[in-house]
Amino acid sequence: MRRPNKAPPAASKDGPRINDDIRNAQIQLIDQTGDNKGTVETVVAIKMAQEAGMDLVEISPNTSPPVCKIMDYGKYKYSAQKKAAEARKRQKTVEIKEIKLRPMIDDHDYDVKMRAMQRFFEEGDKVKITLRYRGREMAHQEIGTKLLDKIKTDVAELAKVEQDARFEGRQVVMVLAPR
């Protein structure tokens, strides 16, 4: 049994409607210099755009009548793509940096880790502190708890605790986020 012939689905276009895609009988027209020409028939507006060597682009389709502008659509589309690319370039993704510690850390090593943490916060990144216990250190978990409390107080003006300290097997994990 044969299937009945179906028309292919209409391709949905991205962006505003231009020229003959505008279906309204009348539109609010803005010319290429930005002057408001008032309510004009769509056919006349398309003719005006073609005489100027430009396109009629629907700016605001939801108003009554829709607002259309005479402009170079290729140039408009190109500048919109450039703006979007620039916005993507400027957008910073927040990374989670990890700092690994041991409960019996020396003072100088602690200072080095704190400087690294401070640099991460200045860059706008979150910091995941992993405190790993080895061997008999598990019997003295209060040392690790004191160390994490000391870290919290030392970075209090730079960061806030996003996820409080919690055990994951033989390690304690805490996440700090910049203020």
UniProtKB/Swiss-Prot annotation:
One Gene Ontology MF term: ribosome binding
Superkingdom classification of source: Bacteria
Location(s), subcellular: Cytoplasm
Record has Cytoplasm as a keyword: yes
Assembly mode: Monomer.
Annotated function: IF-3 binds to the 30S ribosomal subunit and shifts the equilibrium between 70S ribosomes and their 50S and 30S subunits in favor of the free subunits, thus enhancing the availability of 30S subunits on which protein synthesis initiation begins.
Family note: Belongs to the IF-3 family.
Protein name per the record: Translation initiation factor IF-3
Organism: Bradyrhizobium diazoefficiens (strain JCM 10833 / BCRC 13528 / IAM 13628 / NBRC 14792 / USDA 110)
